[in-house]
C-alpha cells in the first residue's frame, strides 16, 4: 500500500484520539447522570413510574426493539394522550443514547484505521499515542458497560420512539440502529470480546509495552522503603541533580489507569493470555492487586467474578479460570495489607518531601518529578481505599479502615500548595533547562537522523526553535507561556512515525521518543502546572462518596493526633468542580452545591470542636480561679487561728486540704493532666483552622477562622449568661465579683487562642461584651444587664421595701435585718462597694444607664401614686401651705389628711432606690476613673464649670454626660426624663406645678409622724435609721430638683418652703407630752440636717433660721447617748 493511500497526516490519528477521549468522558458523565436519575425515585422520569402508563411501558419493553402500534390501541391509549410531553421530556435521554451510538461508530472506525495503518505502540516511546489509544479502549468499554447498567434504557428509548411514531407517523430515523445496539450490548463485554478480535494485535502490543512500567509501579512498601523512593535527603550529594528517567511521563502515570488498561484490555484480547507469558504475568499481577475497579466515579466493576463468568463458557479456559480464582484469593488475603503498608510509607515520604520543600522551595526545580510521582502514588492509594471500603471482605475489615488517611491527604495538599506558590521558581528552572540543554540535545539527535522526511524535519526544527527562543526574562516579565501547540505537534509526530510504512520510524529511533517525552514533561512544568496537579492529584471522586468522606472526617476529629490534618477535607472540596464536563453542564450546579455544603459542614464542625475544647479549658480555668476567691480562705484562716490558740478541732488524722496551685507542681514530666490534653488537642485543631486564610470553592470564598470567631462569640455569650447562674424560681444569682472573676478567666483563655490562630479576639470581646450591656442580645436573648437589673429591682430592693433589708450609709451597702424569715441571700454581698464596682465593670456605662432607667421607671410609678394622693388631699394641703405659722389650724388640718403613712412609705422607697442608684453611680465613676481617667476629669470640668445663667437644656445635656460617667449632679437627668413622661394631657401645666408644690408640702407636714415609729431610731453605727427613713433626704432633694426643673420653677425657693414647713411641723412635736408620739423625736430631727447636707440648694444658715441648731446638737447627743446605753 503506497504512502499516498494511507498517509498518516491525512488520518489525523492524534486529533481523533484527543477528541474522542474527551467526548468519551463527556458521554460517560451523561450516562452516569441518567443512571443516577433513574435510580432515584425523586429524579426518575415520571412516565416510568406513572401507574396509567405501567402496562404500556411493560408492553414496549417486552416487544423491544420491535414497534407495534396498530393492534394494541388499548394498551397504548394513555401514551397517545401524553405523547407530546414524552417527546419533550425524554428527548435529552434519548439523544444521549443516540450520541453513545455515534461515539461507538467513530471509535470503531478509528480502531479499524489504526489496525490498517499497523500502528506501533510502546508506552515508553510514543507515550501520548499509546496512552490515548489505551484510554480510548477503556473509555469505550466502560461506556458500554455503564449503558448496560441503565435498567430503564429500553423503556426510555421505546417510549420516546412510540411517542415519535404517534406524532410523526414513523419511527425516529436513528431508532432501528439504536434499538439493535441496545440488544447487541445486553452483555457488553461478551459482545466486545468478539468485536475486538481484529484489534488484538494492536491492543496486545500496547498492553505488553507496560511490562517494564506496571511491575515497577506495583511494588510493596518494603521495596519502596529499601529503594528510598521519593527521598530527597537519602543522597545529599545528588540533591541538586535533576530527577531524570527515560520514561518521565510513565513515572507519574496512574496505577489505577494502568490496571484498568490491563484488566479490560486482556479481557478483550484474551487469546494473548494463552500465547504470551508476559501478558499473563501482567494480567495476574493486576488481578492480585484489587478486588474491583472504578468504572466511572462511584460505579465499580468486580473484576474476578466478571472475568470468571466470561471465561467459563470458553472451551480450554479452565487454566485461566483457576488463575482468576487464585488471584482473587490473593487479592482478598493480601491486597488490603499491602495497600495499608503503602499508605503508611507514603505518609512519611510525603511528610519528608513537603518539609524539605517548604524549607528549600528551590528544589522544586530539579525534583519536580518527585512531587508529581508522590502525588500520583498517594492519589492511587486513596482511590483504591475509597472504592474497596464498601466492597471489602469482612474478615480483613481493619485493612480498609484508615484513621490516618487525613494525614496523607493533608501532605498531598501541602505539596499542591508548594507547586502553586512556587510556580515561578519552577518556571525559571525549566525555561533555562529547555533552552540551555533540551534544545541542544534535541538538535544533535535530529542532525544525526539518517532519514528525516520534510514534514517531520519542519516539526523537529520548530521544536528546537521554540525552546531556543526561551529566556528567564519572560518569566520575570510575567509572560504567559503556552506549549500546547508544541505538545500536539509531538503527538502528531508520534502518529506519523508509528505507522508501518513511515519513512522515519519511531520504533527505530527510541532515543528520540524518550528525549521528546522528557521535553514534553519540561514544557508542562512551565505552562501547565495546574493541569498537572489535576492529572496527578485530583480527588474529586470524594464528591460521589459523601458518606465515606464524612466518616473519614469524623474519624479524623475523634483522633487528637489527626485533628491537625482535618483542614484537608474542606480543601478537597475545592477539587470537586474538576470532575464536571462541558458535555453535561447541568450537573455543575448540583456538584457545586454539594462542594459548598460539605465544605461548610466540615469547617463548622472543626470550629465547633475547637469551641468545645476552649469551653472545657475555660471551665477548668474558672474552677482553678474560683479556688482563689477570698471566701475559700476562711477555713485556712480558721485552722491557723486554732493552731495558734492550740485548740484541737476536728478529728485526728483529717487529711489536709490541697491548696490552690498544687496542680502546677510536677514530679514527673510523663504525668499529663486533663488541662494538658485539652491544650494539646486545641493546638492541633487550631493548626488546621489557621492553615489557610481562605479557600475558594465554586466561586465562593470560605474563611475557616471566621467560623471559629462566630462560634466563639455565640459560646462566650451563652457562657457569660450561664455563669450568672440566675434561677428565676429561687431568685438566686451569682455575685457580680465572682462573675467578673469567671469572665476575666474566660477572656484570658480566649486571648491565648491568638497564640494558635490569627483571629481578632478583641473583636469577639467587643461584640459580645457590648451586646451584654444591652437589654437583649442580637438573638433576642436576655443579657447579664437584664438579669442583674431584674434581680436588683425585683429581689433586693423589693426586700428593702418589705423591711427585711436596710441601707447603711456608714458601710455604703444594703444589709440584712434580723427577721423571722431568713432571706436566701446576704444583701451586703451584692451591694457593697466591691460588688457594685464589679457590676459596673460587667455592665459598663451602657448597662448601668439601662439599670438607672429601670430604677427611674419604678420611681416614676411611685411619684404617679404620690400625685394621686396629693390630688385626694389638695384642698387641705393648699390651706396647710399658707397656714404653717398657725399651730392650731395646722393641727386641725393635719387630722383631715389621709394616706400620710403611704406618702412617707412611698417617699422612703424612692429614697432607697435613689440610694442604690448613688451606690451604682459611685461605683461606675470609680471604674471609669481607673480605665479612662483623662476623659472623666474632662467631664468633671464640664460639669463643675456650668455658668448659672446657662440655658437649662444645655445644662441638662452636660448633666446627662456627667451622669453617664457616674458623676453626681444637682439635677438627675434620668429622673427628669422619667418624670417628664408622666405629663397628663388633661391637666394644665399650672395644675401640674401646683401638685408638685403640694407634694413637697405633704411630705413636710407628714415628717413628725415618723417619731412615733419604733424603727425610726437613729443608729450612729450605721449613720441611719433601720426603717430607711434616712433615705428620705435623698428622695426629697432629688424629686424636688427634678419636678421643679420640669415645671420651670425655682428649686431653691420650693426647698426653702419645704424646710420652713418641715421645721415648723417638727418643732411642734417638741411640745408634745405623749411619749408614744415623741418616742424617736430626736432621731427624726436629724432628718432636717440630712436633707440640708444632701441638698446643693440649701445651707446650714438657712436651716438655723428655721430650726435652732441647739436642738440638732442636743438631738445628736441624745441619739449617741442612747446608742451607747443600748449597746452596753
From Swiss-Prot:
Q: Where is this region: Disordered?
A: 640-665
- Please state where this protein is localized: Cell membrane; Cell projection, Lamellipodium membrane
Transmembrane ranges, per UniProt, are 995-1015
Q: Which GO terms describe its cellular component?
A: filamentous actin; glutamatergic synapse; lamellipodium; lamellipodium membrane; postsynapse; postsynaptic density; ruffle; SCAR complex
What GO biological process terms are annotated to this protein in UniProt?
A: apical protein localization; basal protein localization; cell migration; cell migration involved in gastrulation; cell morphogenesis; cell projection assembly; cortical actin cytoskeleton organization; embryonic body morphogenesis
Which domain of life does the UniProt lineage start with? Eukaryota
Q: Which UniProt keywords apply?
A: Acetylation, Cell membrane, Cell projection, Membrane, Transmembrane, Transmembrane helix
Output compositional bias ranges, type Basic and acidic residues: 651-665
The membrane topology term of the UniProt record is: Single-pass membrane protein
Q: Which InterPro entries match?
A: Nck-associated_protein-1
> In its keyword annotation, does this UniProt entry include Electron transport?
no
**Its biological purpose:** Part of the WAVE complex that regulates lamellipodia formation. The WAVE complex regulates actin filament reorganization via its interaction with the Arp2/3 complex. Actin remodeling activity is regulated by RAC1. As component of the WAVE1 complex, required for BDNF-NTRK2 endocytic trafficking and signaling from early endosomes.
Query: To which protein family does this belong?
Result: Belongs to the HEM-1/HEM-2 family.
Give the matching PANTHER family. Answer: NCK-ASSOCIATED PROTEIN 1
Kindly state the subunit structure of this protein. Component of the WAVE1 complex composed of ABI2, CYFIP1 or CYFIP2, BRK1, NCKAP1 and WASF1/WAVE1. Within the complex, a heterodimer containing NCKAP1 and CYFIP1 interacts with a heterotrimer formed by WAVE1, ABI2 and BRK1. Component of the WAVE2 complex composed of ABI1, CYFIP1/SRA1, NCKAP1/NAP1 and WASF2/WAVE2. CYFIP2 binds to activated RAC1 which causes the complex to dissociate, releasing activated WASF1. The complex can also be activated by NCK1. Associates preferentially with the first SH3 domain of NCK. Interacts with NYAP1, NYAP2 and MYO16. Interacts with TMEM132D.
Protein name according to UniProt: Nck-associated protein 1
Whose protein is this, by species?
Rattus norvegicus
The organism that produces this protein has a lineage beginning with: Eukaryota, Metazoa, Chordata, Craniata, Vertebrata
Amino acid at each position: 500500500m503506497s504512502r499516498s493511500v494511507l498517509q498518516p497526516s491525512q488520518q489525523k490519528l492524534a486529533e481523533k484520539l484527543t477528541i474522542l477521549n474527551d467526548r468519551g468522558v463527556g458521554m460517560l458523565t451523561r450516562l452516569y447522570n441518567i443512571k443516577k436519575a433513574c435510580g432515584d425515585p425523586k429524579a426518575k422520569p415520571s412516565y416510568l413510574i406513572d401507574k396509567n402508563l405501567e402496562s404500556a411501558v411493560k408492553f414496549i419493553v417486552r416487544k423491544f426493539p420491535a414497534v407495534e402500534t396498530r393492534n394494541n390501541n388499548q394498551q397504548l391509549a394513555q401514551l397517545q394522550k401524553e405523547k407530546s410531553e414524552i417527546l419533550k421530556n425524554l428527548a435529552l435521554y434519548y439523544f444521549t443514547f443516540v450520541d453513545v451510538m455515534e461515539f461507538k461508530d467513530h471509535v470503531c472506525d478509528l480502531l479499524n484505521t489504526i489496525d490498517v495503518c499497523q500502528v506501533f505502540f510502546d508506552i515508553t516511546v510514543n507515550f501520548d499515542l499509546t496512552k490515548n489509544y489505551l484510554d480510548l479502549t477503556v473509555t469505550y468499554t466502560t461506556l458500554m458497560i455503564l449503558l448496560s447498567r441503565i435498567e430503564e434504557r429500553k423503556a426510555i428509548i421505546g417510549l420516546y420512539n412510540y411517542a415519535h411514531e404517534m406524532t410523526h407517523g414513523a419511527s425516529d430515523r436513528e431508532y432501528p440502529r439504536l434499538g439493535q445496539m441496545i440488544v447487541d450490548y445486553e452483555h457488553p463485554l461478551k459482545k466486545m470480546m468478539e468485536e475486538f478480535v481484529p484489534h488484538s494485535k494492536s491492543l496486545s502490543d500496547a498492553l505488553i509495552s507496560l511490562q517494564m512500567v506496571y511491575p515497577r509501579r506495583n511494588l510493596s512498601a518494603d521495596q519502596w522503603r529499601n529503594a528510598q523512593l521519593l527521598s530527597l535527603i537519602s543522597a545529599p550529594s545528588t540533591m541538586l541533580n535533576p530527577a531524570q528517567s527515560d520514561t518521565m511521563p510513565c513515572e507519574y502515570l496512574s496505577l489505577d489507569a494502568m490496571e484498568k488498561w490491563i484488566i479490560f484490555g486482556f479481557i478483550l484480547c484474551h487469546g494473548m493470555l494463552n500465547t504470551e507469558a508476559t501478558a499473563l504475568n501482567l494480567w495476574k499481577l493486576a488481578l492480585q492487586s484489587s478486588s474491583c475497579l472504578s468504572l466511572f466515579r462511584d460505579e465499580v466493576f468486580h473484576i474476578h467474578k466478571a472475568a470468571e463468568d466470561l471465561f467459563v463458557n470458553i472451551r480450554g479456559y479452565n487454566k485461566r479460570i483457576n488463575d482468576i480464582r487464585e488471584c482473587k484469593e490473593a487479592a482478598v488475603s493480601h491486597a488490603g495489607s499491602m495497600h495499608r503498608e503503602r499508605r503508611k510509607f507514603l505518609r512519611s515520604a510525603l511528610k519528608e518531601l513537603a518539609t524539605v520543600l517548604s524549607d528549600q522551595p528551590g528544589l522544586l526545580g530539579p525534583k519536580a518529578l518527585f512531587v508529581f510521582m508522590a502525588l500520583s502514588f498517594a492519589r492511587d492509594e486513596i482511590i483504591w481505599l475509597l472504592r474497596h471500603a464498601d466492597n471489602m471482605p469482612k474478615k480483613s475489615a481493619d485493612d480498609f479502615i484508615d484513621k490516618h488517611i487525613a494525614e496523607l491527604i493533608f501532605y498531598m495538599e501541602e505539596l499542591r500548595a508548594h507547586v502553586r506558590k512556587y510556580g515561578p521558581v519552577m518556571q525559571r528552572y525549566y525555561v533555562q533547562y529547555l533552552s540551555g540543554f533540551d534544545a541542544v540535545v534535541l538538535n544533535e539527535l535530529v542532525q544525526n537522523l539518517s532519514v528525516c522526511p520534510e514534514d517531520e524535519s519542519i516539526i523537529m526544527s520548530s521544536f528546537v526553535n521554540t525552546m531556543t527562543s526561551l529566556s528567564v526574562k519572560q518569566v520575570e516579565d510575567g509572560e504567559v507561556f503556552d506549549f500546547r501547540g508544541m505538545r500536539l505537534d509531538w503527538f502528531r509526530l508520534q502518529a506519523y512515525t508509528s505507522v508501518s510504512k513511515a519513512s522515519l520510524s519511531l520504533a527505530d529511533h527510541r532515543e528520540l521518543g524518550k528525549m521528546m517525552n522528557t521535553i514534553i514533561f519540561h514544557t508542562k512544568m512551565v505552562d501547565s502546572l495546574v493541569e498537572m496537579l489535576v492529572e496527578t492529584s485530583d480527588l474529586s471522586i470524594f464528591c460521589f462518596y459523601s458518606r465515606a468522606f464524612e466518616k473519614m472526617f469524623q474519624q479524623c476529629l475523634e483522633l487528637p493526633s489527626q485533628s491537625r490534618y482535618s483542614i484537608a477535607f474542606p480543601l478537597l472540596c475545592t477539587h470537586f468542580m474538576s470532575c464536571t464536563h462541558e458535555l453535561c453542564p447541568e450537573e455543575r450546579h448540583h456538584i457545586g452545591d454539594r462542594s459548598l455544603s460539605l465544605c461548610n459542614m466540615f469547617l463548622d464542625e472543626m470550629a465547633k470542636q475547637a469551641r468545645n475544647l476552649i469551653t472545657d479549658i475555660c471551665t477548668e480555668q474558672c474552677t482553678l480561679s474560683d479556688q482563689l476567691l477570698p471566701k475559700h480562705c476562711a477555713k485556712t484562716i480558721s485552722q491557723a487561728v486554732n493552731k495558734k490558740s492550740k485548740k484541737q478541732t476536728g478529728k485526728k488524722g483529717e487529711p489536709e486540704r490541697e491548696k490552690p496551685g498544687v496542680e502546677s507542681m510536677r514530679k514527673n514530666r510523663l504525668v499529663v493532666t486533663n488541662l494538658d490534653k485539652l491544650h494539646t488537642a486545641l493546638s492541633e485543631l487550631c493548626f488546621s483552622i489557621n492553615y489557610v486564610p481562605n479557600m475558594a470553592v465554586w466561586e465562593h470564598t470560605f474563611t475557616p477562622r471566621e467560623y471559629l470567631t462566630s462560634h466563639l462569640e455565640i459560646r462566650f455569650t451563652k457562657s457569660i449568661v450561664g455563669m450568672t447562674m440566675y434561677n428565676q424560681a429561687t431568685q438566686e444569682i451569682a455575685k457580680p465579683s465572682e462573675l467578673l472573676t469567671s469572665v476575666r478567666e474566660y477572656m484570658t483563655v480566649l486571648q491565648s487562642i491568638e497564640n494558635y490562630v490569627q483571629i481578632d479576639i478583641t473583636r469577639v470581646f467587643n461584640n459580645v461584651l457590648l451586646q451584654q450591656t444591652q437589654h437583649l442580645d442580637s438573638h433576642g436573648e436576655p443579657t447579664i444587664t437584664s438579669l442583674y437589673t431584674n434581680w436588683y429591682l425585683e429581689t433586693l430592693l423589693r426586700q428593702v421595701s418589705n423591711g427585711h433589708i436596710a441601707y447603711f450609709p456608714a458601710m455604703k451597702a444594703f444589709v440584712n435585718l434580723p427577721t423571722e424569715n431568713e432571706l436566701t441571700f446576704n444583701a451586703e454581698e451584692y451591694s457593697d462597694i466591691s460588688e457594685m464596682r464589679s457590676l459596673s465593670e460587667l455592665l459598663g456605662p451602657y448597662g448601668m444607664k439601662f439599670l438607672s432607667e429601670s430604677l427611674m421607671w419604678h420611681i416614676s410609678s411611685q411619684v404617679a401614686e404620690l400625685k394621686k394622693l396629693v390630688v385626694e388631699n389638695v384642698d387641705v394641703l393648699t390651706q396647710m401651705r399658707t397656714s404653717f405659722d398657725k399651730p392650731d389650724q395646722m393641727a386641725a388640718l393635719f387630722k383631715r389628711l389621709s394616706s400620710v403613712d403611704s406618702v412617707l412609705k412611698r417617699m422612703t422607697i424612692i429614697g432607697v432606690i435613689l440610694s442604690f442608684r448613688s451606690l451604682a453611680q459611685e461605683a461606675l465613676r470609680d471604674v471609669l476613673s481607673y480605665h479612662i481617667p483623662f476623659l472623666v476629669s474632662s467631664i468633671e470640668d464640664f460639669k463643675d464649670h456650668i455658668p448659672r445663667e446657662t440655658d437649662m437644656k444645655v445644662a441638662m445635656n452636660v448633666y446627662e454626660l456627667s451622669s453617664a460617667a457616674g458623676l453626681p449632679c444637682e439635677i438627675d437627668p434620668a429622673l427628669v426624663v422619667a418624670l417628664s413622661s408622666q405629663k397628663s394631657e388633661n391637666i394644665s401645666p399650672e395644675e401640674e406645678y401646683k401638685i408638685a408644690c403640694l407634694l413637697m408640702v405633704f411630705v413636710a407636714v407628714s415628717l413628725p409622724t415618723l417619731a412615733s415609729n419604733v424603727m425610726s431610731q437613729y443608729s450612729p453605727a450605721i449613720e441611719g435609721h433601720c426603717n430607711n427613713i434616712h433615705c428620705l433626704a435623698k428622695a426629697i432633694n432629688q424629686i424636688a430638683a427634678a419636678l421643679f426643673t420640669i415645671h420651670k420653677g425655682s428649686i431653691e425657693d420650693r426647698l426653702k418652703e419645704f424646710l420652713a414647713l418641715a421645721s415648723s411641723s417638727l418643732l411642734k412635736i417638741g411640745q408634745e407630752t405623749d411619749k408614744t408620739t415623741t418616742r424617736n423625736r430626736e432621731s427624726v430631727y436629724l432628718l432636717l440636717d440630712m436633707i440640708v447636707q444632701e441638698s446643693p440648694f440649701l445651707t446650714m444658715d438657712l436651716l438655723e433660721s428655721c430650726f435652732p441648731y441647739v436642738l440638732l446638737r442636743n438631738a445628736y447627743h441624745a441619739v449617741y447617748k442612747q446608742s451607747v446605753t443600748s449597746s452596753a
